[in-house]
Amino acid sequence: MPPVMSLRALICVVLIAAAPAAAAPFVPESDSQVLERLPFSSGDPGLRRLRGLNDQLTRTPNDLPLAILVAQGYAELGRTTGDPRYAGYAQAALAPWWGLDRAPQEVLVLRAALRQRMHQFDLALTDLATVLNTNPRNVQARLMRATVQQVQGAYDEAKQECRALQDLTQELVWTACLANVNGVTGELRQSYEQLLSVFARYPVAEPKLRSWVLTSLAEMATRAGMMTAAEAHFRAALALDAADFYLLGAYADYLLDDGRPPEVLALLRDKVAADPLLLRYALALQAAQHSQELPARVEQLRDRFAASRLRGDRVHLREEARFTLHLLNAPQEALKLAQENWQVQKEPADIRILLEAALAANDATAVGIATDWLRNCRLEDMQLSRLMPAAKHQG
């Protein structure tokens, strides 16, 4: 088992990588611009400390340990808040090494995490390969490579990386890694039960690790239709990390699918700065028939996605496809977005919006692509199962 600080660093980097970015990162032109734009709260000691570290880094920009600390701090803020600027601030902290092919390993791992956040998956894999070619026992790089490969649908490769972790880190970490992959390739119930059993043996694990595992358990339970168990896992995870916007989005999706839009509105009312959370808030308004507020939120989302397109940012294609299908009722355009997104990432939510849009657009070819994928990877998902009768009819 790695020492506590190493495990914390591992969890930090992996969670940073796993969290979706809210938009293309803002990369400041100077350190003064960073300080000028950051929404620091004077009452938050953690943010005050980070600002102090950034001040110090401005004076000693080539201090690698300090730069890593500052970059991790910014990246963690981006993960929990969904503010896209923080990824840019993290990149700025690493500026002396960012463009180097052979940067220090700590930089390569963190750069890979940030690139994954920006959906630059191939670049992230290149960085991780460089690290692992030099140090095959780098746990952060192996776990992150498994995560990227799973997102891309390279499941055999992801499983290989997870198995390689068995001799490198604690059982809970590698079990969660393997359960996440097996859980989308035909072994959902077994993976859930195995991870739940191992998790019970780590009651005092690091809180961020527990939150990550609980979120995985919640998503697996949701796909399996075990709604009571999913609810318990989501609530336990939120008790540990109530500010994590990925977790908030996953729980909001669970509540929407469970027909509980008023709870989504209460959950996200003051958290709509992040585009994915604003989308779920608007979907809840629609489901709850809040006709007065909904038009303004739809226009807000329309403006945000338009601005993203102008920047060349296509990180949130999945969310834009959901918006276009469910809030604009434009299935043909939604299908184009879902297909573009499918070229980049292949998670359960991606195949779901692809199939939903294909069915709404009456596109038998696209329906066939989605159902072939589901059959080949053996993905089990209650919501997708409900779509299959219509898919078989169209296919």
Model-found features: residue ranges?
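N-terminal leader/linker segments that initiate helical-solenoid repeat arrays
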Residues: 22-106, 126, 393
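Short coil turns that delineate tetratricopeptide repeat
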Residues: 61, 102, 136, 169-170, ...
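Structural motif corresponding to the intra-repeat A-B loop/turn of tetratricopeptide repeats
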Residues: 77, 81-84, 118, 152, ...
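Canonical tetratricopeptide repeat
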Residues: 69, 110, 144, 177-178, ...
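Single-residue signature of alpha-solenoid repeat helices
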Residues: 49, 90, 124, 158, ...
